[in-house]
């Protein structure tokens, strides 16, 4: 019996508590420390549902490839000679060695360095080494039997590539739901769309992956954890009034209005109005955006900072800098984060400002990330003592469905918060996680029953 078989539905059901009448919104800290839950998450969330893989701009040319992970499984994405994108498990169909061992490159064919089998970048086995007299059976390499294993579901939305190793998942657009409209507001900043800029930062923190997924939409911690950044920015503002490359200030973040939106399938967003939107790289484009998309959407594109979580592994952040933040769980208490700066294509005159804003706050050597990582470590250490995490802040003014601001931009969240410090979005996200864990336990139980019956 596998370790996950010792997980009962009653245990899963007890991990997240929500009682509106009693004002209880909390979760047990075991959900961040139990290795049995981590095994289920890897199999049924990171390998068994849609997750973010890459952006199309990272595989721009024919024969380009890009490697990444889906849970515990290595993946690579290729653009073949016809310009079509494909995603495969990064393992030779012969004996399982990885084919692509660099982050990215350009190859029309991929030859395994173990036994020399060669595959096209469309996944077809082209040749095996020394086939003459090898004595392969007649069934060898028939009907694609030894081609590379494709990622079961692979799709793009506005240049963002997603995959699932399980076939029976909802269509991607249905999975993304209302969060697609937020993606649209970021992509539509340029007629040519977005591109990922060269360079990245990767780091590992000592904590569960869900801590980062929470924190990316946690407006409550900003003034406490990032007070030093806010103070530094205020000094810069006074000292460098004529600076062309101005970092966005955190000193009044959320003070000009903000809130959150919870969407279906664990997606969520925290937002806040900028006190100084004129420092945004896109500010000069406001008239064009208003003409194309209307005043309300143009206001959101420029005047509002937003952190959008595309559950479970991507944050699309458009605030102190513009970035993709990708979460990769390594173990129940270790998580790898990779961040990339993104920008509208063709933004050359304002590119420097965008990159400097990104580096200032978010880079691994920036003024915010190290502070966050220390809090993640401290949380994971504290979780060992058990107990409950409270998520009730703002409960008296959460709004079922869209608030007035969401209606102005035709956004229909499941829950709205009127302040960026409110915690209702964590309740919604962890309830979705709980539902996925219940489904996972049932699938594992059904699999065991089927195996015992054979």
From Swiss-Prot:
GO terms for molecular function: 2 iron, 2 sulfur cluster binding; dioxygenase activity; iron ion binding. Keywords: 2Fe-2S, Aromatic hydrocarbons catabolism, Dioxygenase, Iron, Iron-sulfur, Metal-binding, NAD, Oxidoreductase, Plasmid. [2Fe-2S] cluster binds at residues 92, 94, 112, 115. Transmembrane segments: none annotated. Pathway: Xenobiotic degradation; toluene degradation. Its EC number is 1.14.12.-. GO terms for biological process: toluene catabolic process. Pfam families: Rieske (PF00355), Ring_hydroxyl_A (PF00848). Its cofactor is [2Fe-2S] cluster; Fe cation. It is an enzyme of class 1 (oxidoreductase). Residues 51-148 form the Rieske domain. Binds 1 [2Fe-2S] cluster. This dioxygenase system consists of three proteins: the two subunits of the hydroxylase component (XylX and XylY), and an electron transfer component (XylZ). Belongs to the bacterial ring-hydroxylating dioxygenase alpha subunit family. PANTHER family: 3-PHENYLPROPIONATE_CINNAMIC ACID DIOXYGENASE SUBUNIT ALPHA, CHOLINE MONOOXYGENASE, CHLOROPLASTIC. This is Toluate 1,2-dioxygenase subunit alpha. The gene is xylX.
């Amino acid at each position: 019996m596998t370790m996950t078989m010792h997980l009962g539905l009653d245990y899963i059901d007890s991990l997240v508590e929500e009682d509106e009448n009693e004002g209880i919104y909390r979760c047990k800290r075991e959900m961040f420390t139990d290795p049995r839950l981590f095994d289920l998450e890897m199999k049924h969330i990171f390998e068994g549902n849609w997750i973010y893989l890459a952006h199309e701009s990272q595989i721009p040319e024919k024969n380009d490839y890009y490697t990444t992970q889906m849970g515990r499984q290595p993946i690579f994405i290729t653009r073949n000679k016809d310009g079509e994108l494909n995603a495969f498990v990064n393992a030779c169909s012969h004996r399982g060695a990885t084919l692509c061992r660099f982050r990215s490159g350009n190859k029309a064919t991929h030859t395994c360095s173990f036994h020399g089998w060669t595959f096209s970048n469309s996944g077809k086995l082209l040749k095996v080494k020394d086939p003459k007299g090898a004595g392969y059976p007649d069934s060898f390499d028939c009907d694609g039997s030894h081609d590379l294993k494709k990622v079961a579901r692979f799709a793009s939305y506005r240049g963002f590539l997603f995959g699932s190793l399980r076939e029976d998942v909802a269509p991607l657009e249905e999975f993304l739901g209302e969060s697609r409209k937020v993606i649209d507001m970021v992509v539509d900043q340029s007629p040519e769309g977005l591109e990922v800029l060269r360079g990245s930062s990767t780091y590992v923190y000592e904590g569960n992956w869900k801590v980062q997924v929470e924190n990316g939409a946690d407006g409550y911690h900003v003034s406490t954890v990032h007070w030093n950044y806010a103070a530094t920015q205020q000094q810069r503002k006074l000292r460098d009034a004529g600076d062309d490359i101005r970092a966005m200030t955190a000193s009044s973040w959320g003070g000009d209005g903000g809130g959150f939106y919870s969407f279906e399938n664990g997606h969520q967003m925290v937002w806040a109005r900028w006190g100084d939107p004129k420092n945004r790289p896109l500010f000069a484009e406001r008239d064009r955006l208003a003409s194309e998309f209307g005043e309300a959407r143009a206001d959101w594109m420029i005047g509002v900072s937003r952190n959008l979580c595309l559950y479970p592994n991507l944050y699309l952040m458009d605030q102190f800098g513009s970035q993709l933040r990708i979460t990769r769980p390594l173990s129940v208490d270790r998580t790898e984060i990779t961040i990339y700066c993104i920008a509208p294509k063709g933004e050359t005159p304002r590119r420097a400002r965008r990159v400097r804003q990104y580096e200032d706050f978010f880079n691994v050597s920036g003024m915010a990330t190290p502070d966050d990582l220390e809090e993640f470590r401290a949380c994971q250490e504290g979780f060992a003592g058990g107990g409950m995490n409270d998520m009730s802040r703002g409960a008296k003014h959460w709004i079922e469905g869209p608030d007035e601001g969401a209606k102005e931009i035709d956004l229909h969240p499941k829950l709205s918060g009127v302040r960026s410090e409110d915690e209702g979005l964590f309740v919604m996200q962890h309830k979705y996680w709980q539902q996925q864990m219940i489904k996972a336990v049932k699938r594992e139980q059904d699999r065991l029953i089927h195996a015992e019956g054979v």
